[in-house]
Amino acid sequence: MGAALSDTNYAVIYDLHSHTTASDGLLTPETLVHRAVEMRVGTLAITDHDTTAAIPAAREEISRSGLALNLIPGVEISTVWENHEIHIVGLNIDIAHPAMRDFLAQQTERRQARGRLIAERLEKAHIPGAWEGALRLANGGAVTRGHFARFLVECGKAATMADVFKKYLARGKTGYVPPQWCTIEQAIDVIHHSGGKAVLAHPGRYDLSAKWLKRLVAHFADHHGDAMEVAQCQQSPNERTQLATLARQHHLWASLGSDFHQPCPWIELGRKLWLPAGVEGVWQTWEQPQISQ
């Protein structure tokens, strides 16, 4: 997968982490799948936050337009571990499975409750209208902290989304509300019940020391997690190698994904997504041909 690409002959690019307007992405499902093809992605997973609402529209557009794109139904589930918000991606799930549907309905209720509390805290800090602003920006999708961040940038409270999180939404700041999500174990369980593979999302992005990151990966593996994201767009070669080593040590499959939310200079669908030597791609768990009995 690390081989150079040419116009006529190139390896399949996998991007197994992306977002749409169903959560905090800026592209509709239809636009996202077309962009994926433009970026030469061959297999794309849509993994919106605690919702699978984008999958049917994406499937329909791929079929309608005859796109050469393999769509993997997915979801990114918010969990809490040791007072840290940790995201678990479910890949190749059955989005119609009753267990998954019921579970995501509960997650939506938790997300709405947290959003209202964030808005209340911002209101007390003399920033009115945050809930209405976040709802407007979500446009019918799940309300996330990203929508509050966009609202605050819109209001001139900060120059960038990153600045908003540092100033208002990070732990200890005005708009921070401790998450009340499910556990990692519960997320893994519902993903498995719906026929999918559980993946520890962007492990290098959490505010954890090397020691605590090792504890997180061990906890995830001990509770039957399947894979961890090893490769992302923005990442030092050293981090990619270290994550691959952790995956091997805990006998986890490797995943990779851009975590694409919107077109920007530094994150793009399929960009720099290759696995180091010594790890195996999680897609092999569903692409391997079945042996006939």
Curated annotation (Swiss-Prot):
Keywords: Exonuclease, Hydrolase, Manganese, Metal-binding, Nuclease, Nucleotide-binding, rRNA processing. Mn(2+) 3 binds at residues 76, 87, 202. Mn(2+) 2 binds at residues 24, 49, 261. It comes from the Bacteria. InterPro entries: PHP_dom, PHP_domain, Pol/His_phosphatase_N, Pol/histidinol_Pase-like. Its cofactor is Mn(2+). Its EC number is 3.1.13.-, 3.1.3.97. The keyword Membrane does not apply. Mn(2+) 1 binds at residues 17, 19, 76, 259. It catalyses: a ribonucleoside 3',5'-bisphosphate + H2O = a ribonucleoside 5'-phosphate + phosphate. GO terms for biological process: rRNA processing. GO terms for molecular function: 3',5'-nucleotide bisphosphate phosphatase activity; 5'-3' DNA exonuclease activity; 5'-3' RNA exonuclease activity; metal ion binding; nucleotide binding. NCBIfam families: RNaseRnm (NF047791). Exoribonuclease that catalyzes the last steps of 5S, 16S and 23S rRNA 5'-end maturation. Removes 3 nucleotides (nt) from the 5' end of 5S, 16S and 23S rRNA precursors to generate the mature 5' ends. 5S and 23S rRNA maturation occurs more efficiently and accurately on ribosomal particles as compared to free RNA. Efficiently catalyzes the hydrolysis of the 3'-phosphate from 3',5'-bis-phosphonucleotides as well as the successive hydrolysis of 5'-phosphomononucleotides from the 5'-end of short pieces of RNA and DNA, with no specificity toward the identity of the nucleotide base. Belongs to the PHP family. TrpH/YciV subfamily. This is 5'-3' exoribonuclease Rnm. It comes from Salmonella typhimurium (strain LT2 / SGSC1412 / ATCC 700720). The gene is rnm.
